[in-house]
Swiss-Prot record:
The gene is Anxa6. Annexin repeats lie at residues 20-91, 92-163, 175-247, 251-322, 363-434, 435-506, 521-595, 599-670. GO terms for biological process: apoptotic signaling pathway; calcium ion transport; mitochondrial calcium ion homeostasis; regulation of muscle contraction. Keywords: Acetylation, Annexin, Calcium, Calcium/phospholipid-binding, Cytoplasm, Phosphoprotein, Repeat. Its main location: cytoplasm. Coiled coil: none annotated. The modification Phosphotyrosine is found at residues 30, 201. The keyword Repeat applies. This is Annexin A6.
Amino acid sequence: MAKIAQGAMYRGSVHDFPEFDANQDAEALYTAMKGFGSDKESILELITSRSNKQRQEICQNYKSLYGKDLIEDLKYELTGKFERLIVNLMRPLAYCDAKEIKDAISGVGTDEKCLIEILASRTNEQMHQLVAAYKDAYERDLESDIIGDTSGHFQKMLVVLLQGTRENDDVVSEDLVQQDVQDLYEAGELKWGTDEAQFIYILGNRSKQHLRLVFDEYLKTTGKPIEASIRGELSGDFEKLMLAVVKCIRSTPEYFAERLFKAMKGLGTRDNTLIRIMVSRSELDMLDIREIFRTKYEKSLYSMIKNDTSGEYKKALLKLCGGDDDAAGQFFPEAAQVAYQMWELSAVSRVELKGTVCAANDFNPDADAKALRKAMKGIGTDEATIIDIVTHRSNAQRQQIRQTFKSHFGRDLMADLKSEISGDLARLILGLMMPPAHYDAKQLKKAMEGAGTDEKTLIEILATRTNAEIRAINEAYKEDYHKSLEDALSSDTSGHFRRILISLATGNREEGGENRDQAQEDAQVAAEILEIADTPSGDKTSLETRFMTVLCTRSYPHLRRVFQEFIKKTNYDIEHVIKKEMSGDVKDAFVAIVQSVKNKPLFFADKLYKSMKGAGTDEKTLTRVMVSRSEIDLLNIRREFIEKYDKSLHQAIEGDTSGDFMKALLALCGGED
């Protein structure tokens, strides 16, 4: 079994088998493979129930008893993916890694993803064992083989990682952290070109503890996460390797949870990746991987394997998984503490919000007004000029252009634009030309017009706007539609959902910091209303009102503390419990508030992704988010989008829209990540 650090808790899913008898197991395997056909059920049941150390003893005893190589017999009797999985389980981990790397660099082409996964994630000790195992198994030098099969900075970083010399100090020098941040910044963002050697040296040698502090300081200093700089400064396999290293520094289990999800999502399964990870992590951190997988993807690893594989192969993988975490949102007690600590860190870090559209330099409203008039005069319309001007001016500058246009030509720019452009492009351009509060007011009005109500739009706007933005929306709504927003919401919605929306529409959310004592009380209210408290108290109607008050009026910093206390109190994530225990519009509203508090840019990244995935595009949502966030946090949304969906927002827009609408959206997007 894997060696456990003193005082550490074992987080693998496979344990030493009690009352283990290597002779008896060797005999059982021999019997299972004797005669015509083989008893695959017995083979998988036995091998997946033994630790790696015990399997090595079985191999030895099998050879002593029968004079045969157990692995060779298994290869002969089994086939396909099931054979690969069982044979990998029978090898010591270092030899399993060595075989994977040998396969990755043999023949035509190189499996760079396999090289990256193994070399970015292994500890110093595991790396030394890998090098020795490779030498023993193939009588070749691993470093020489990697140098012969790779090139450039990618090769250099692989060689650095292969040395297994990452620092292990728990004591971190603040001065060295600051120096490394400065060196990385100067090597990338501040340099014409990139000094890759600095990235290789720092990310390849510093301790994990040190690098986590470097990443935190880098974000504070530059306003962007280290991943964004890597994507901007590096490219190709080298970029992928460095991003994998950063992910493993931050959280190795999260890195593998992502790899497993990507191995099974979409059409087809990447079985080699699935096998490699399930085998290599089964005695290290599978419980942590399972927990992160469930929290991140809202489904258990067990259920995804069950739905994506079949036969004995599936049964063996499920045994390695070790259990189905079907209580969505519930943390293992140990993982709850990790989640609690993550909230502590997120409370400390302050991410600077940045839009993609800012005020144009050398702004000349007179010239812009004339250019727009020319673009719309005569036969045909010059859409390119309209897009270029409107998407590259701030909203305040656009209002000046509107005023100047009227002063010069005695015409309403909005009316002229309406008559010259149409469809999705018109919705986008006209939205950009409106003051933000009036634009939001119009979106709310449209959501309540006609038959049926667009609850999703009401929730999206009211759950995410600041107090100042909400108050401005109220004024704009009254001015434009001669009716208060509250009256409109009252007449168009009902019940608890109406109360939530009206509460949000008052714009009276507290704006102070956290109150720890109050946070504990609020967490208890949440636990009681969501029916997971040990000692529920008070009538349900009163609790519902208090819960609504907590989510709709407490400040964001305070609510983050409430969510943290909720985890501590219940071992559950509040978002998952709301999804499980509530329903309909009330559930959607509360989930939106929680997601906005946790990470508002990620909330909007999800909205954008869902507006473009699957058959057809939800152009209205796509337009609304791109218009409303372009000067606030669209750059942050872009970063969250690529981090979660493994493709850039730019790529998603390019693949899902077309023509002038696409050009205008890409201009707002502000660049490719």
